[in-house]
Swiss-Prot record:
It is found in: Plastid, Chloroplast. InterPro entries: Ribosomal_uS2, Ribosomal_uS2_bac/mit/plastid, Ribosomal_uS2_CS, Ribosomal_uS2_flav_dom_sf. The keyword RNA-binding does not apply. Transmembrane segments: none annotated. One of its GO terms (biological process) is translation. The gene is rps2. Signal peptide: none annotated. This is Small ribosomal subunit protein uS2c.
């Protein structure tokens, strides 16, 4: 994997609060190598390590994107949801930003069936077929369509399992992470000071609670994905 320069600066990481970890009483000892200090009762993440692993994650994302690999971005907590949506749309990635439905990947047949039903309902709505049904039936199907749009809207164009999954909050998205581990799908994961760095294939030590921190990390990864896709087109 070729190393590239991704313009990751300490100034922008400090400004985004990437270095702020959790309360020192709520830490995971396995994060010790990524912590540089304690300040006012919280752990401070070593930004040198953050820059290194974020750069490596960007290299991985670039290479995967240049080979046409498919990405899924997962971040369902309120502070991450908007950033996840914007990042995914910008990089043309699939995303989950509301709720991880258990078995979304490990029970792919069921997910695929739901997506098929979702597509059918969207078609029926666009063609006006739903409005021609009895009111009660139309209302029920519209509620179902709304449910699908909320929970499956970000993966409606996904036709198979993703090649790489980017996870914003390891603890919040633990079920998604476990499904990736079960299926052998590589993961890039933001890890705060209360996380386990050994669970993901590529861990980025960073504040996973601050919106600015989440946005910064995702922006770097998205830029790498976009550059990788552009590289693929140029070399075609």
């Amino acid at each position: 994997m070729t190393k590239r320069y991704w313009n990751i600066t300490f100034e922008e990481m400090m400004e985004a609060g990437v270095h702020f970890g959790h309360d020192t009483r709520k830490w995971n000892p396995r994060m010790a190598p990524f912590i540089s200090a304690k300040r006012k009762g919280i752990h401070i993440t070593n930004l040198t390590k953050t820059a290194r692993f974020l750069s490596e994650a960007c290299d991985l994302a670039f290479d995967a994107a240049s080979k046409g690999k498919q990405f899924l971005i997962v971040g369902t907590k309120k502070k991450a949801a908007d950033s996840v949506t914007r990042a995914a749309i910008r990089a043309r990635c699939h995303y989950v930003n509301k709720k991880w439905l258990r078995g979304m990947l490990t029970n792919w047949y069921t997910t695929e069936t739901r997506l098929g039903k979702f597509r059918d309902l969207r078609t029926e709505q666009k063609t006006g077929k739903l409005n021609s049904l009895p009111k009660r039936d139309a209302a029920m199907l519209k509620r179902q369509l709304s449910h699908f749009e909320t929970y499956l809207g970000g993966i409606k164009y996904m036709t198979g399992l993703p090649d790489i999954v980017i996870i914003v909050d390891q603890q919040k998205e633990y079920t998604a992470l476990q499904e990736c581990i079960t299926l052998g799908i590589p993961t890039i994961c933001l890890i705060d000071t209360n996380c386990d760095p050994d669970l993901a294939d590529m861990s980025i030590p960073a504040n996973d609670d601050a919106i600015a921190s989440i946005r910064l990390i995702l922006n770097k990864l998205v830029f790498a994905i976009c550059e990788g896709r552009s590289s693929s087109i140029r070399n075609y």
